[in-house]
From Swiss-Prot:
Described function: Transmembrane adapter protein which associates with KLRK1 to form an activation receptor KLRK1-HCST in lymphoid and myeloid cells; this receptor plays a major role in triggering cytotoxicity against target cells expressing cell surface ligands such as MHC class I chain-related MICA and MICB, and UL16-binding proteins (ULBPs); these ligands are up-regulated by stress conditions and pathological state such as viral infection and tumor transformation. Functions as a docking site for PI3-kinase PIK3R1 and GRB2.
Record topology, Extracellular segments: 19-34
Entry-linked InterPro entries: HCST (IPR009861)
Pfam families documented for this protein: DAP10 (PF07213)
Record PTM: Phosphorylated; PIK3R1 and GRB2 associate specifically with tyrosine-phosphorylated HCST.
Bilayer topology term: Single-pass type I membrane protein
Species of the source: Macaca mulatta
Region listing for PIK3R1 binding site, in residue ranges: 72-75
Name of the protein this chain belongs to: Hematopoietic cell signal transducer
Signal peptide, first to last residue: 1-18
Amino acid sequence: MIHPGHILFLLLLPVAAAQTTPGSCSGCGSLSLPLLAGLVAADAVASPLIVGAVFLCARPRRSPAQGDGKVYINMPGRG
């Protein structure tokens, strides 16, 4: 189900976009095609590396086997 606030945001988005003047970015330059292709390629390489690192760090690890064969003094039933 869509939250009513999200619908209101989507309806007001064109109004906000219409109020911005075109070319209002001072000091912004256009990106050359090789630079844009390099950014996309770097993102394509970095994203799977980040996902893989998060997967390796977040996966459940096997806990080492508890030493049930140990003899416990002062613990009845364990020895």
